[in-house]
Design a protein with these regions (language model features):
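Short helix-initiation/N-cap motifs at beta->coil->alpha
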Residues: 58-72
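Stable alpha-helical elements in mature extracytoplasmic
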Residues: 5, 9-12, 37-48, 67, ...
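Sec/Tat-exported extracytoplasmic proteins
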Residues: 17-20, 48-56, 75, 89-93
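Alpha-to-beta junction loops
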Residues: 73-81, 95
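Glycine-centered hinge/linker elements that transmit conformational signals in sensory
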Residues: 29-61
Length: 129
C-alpha cells in the first residue's frame, strides 16, 4: 500500500479498535495493546478489500488518486477521507456527499458519534448561530 493510502487504513481505521480497548481498560496510554478488538478491525478491513473497485491482489498498486477517481466517477459509493479532500470531490455535488460512521461491531458504538482524525474540531450548536 502506498503512502497516500497507508495512513487511512493503518492509522485512522486502526484507531477504532485501539480506542475501544483503551476505553475498556480505562487508560490513555500503553506500551503495547492487548488486541482485544483486532478481530473487529480485521472484519472491517475484509469488508473494505472484498468490496473494493479492484481485486484485493491489486490494492497494493492503487493510490489515493485512484480512490478519488473511483468515487468521483461513481465507480465507488464510499470514500474514506477527510475534509481536506473536498476540493477533489466537490464536483459530485454537496447533495451527494455525507458522513457515515464506521462501525466495527462494538456494543453501544451507534451512540458514540463520528470519529475524527484531526487536531482541531469545531462544533457549533445550530441555536447559537
Amino acid at each position: 500500500m502506498d503512502g497516500s493510502s497507508d495512513w487511512r487504513f493503518k492509522t485512522h481505521l486502526a484507531n477504532l479498535p485501539i480506542y475501544y480497548e483503551y476505553k475498556d481498560e480505562g487508560i490513555d496510554n500503553t506500551d503495547a495493546i492487548k488486541g482485544t478488538y483486532l478481530d473487529n478491525y480485521r472484519q472491517i478491513w475484509d469488508l473494505y478489500i472484498n468490496n473494493a473497485t479492484c481485486k484485493p491482489t491489486e490494492l497494493s498498486t492503487k493510490t489515493a488518486d485512484d480512490a478519488t477517481a473511483d468515487f468521483v466517477t461513481g465507480d465507488a459509493v464510499f470514500y474514506q477521507n477527510g475534509t481536506w479532500e473536498y476540493n477533489n470531490i466537490k464536483d459530485v455535488g454537496d447533495d451527494n456527499l455525507g458522513i457515515l460512521p464506521i462501525y466495527i461491531g462494538v456494543e453501544g458504538e451507534e451512540d458514540q458519534g463520528i470519529c475524527t482524525g484531526t487536531e482541531k474540531l469545531l462544533v457549533c450548536k445550530l441555536q447559537s448561530i
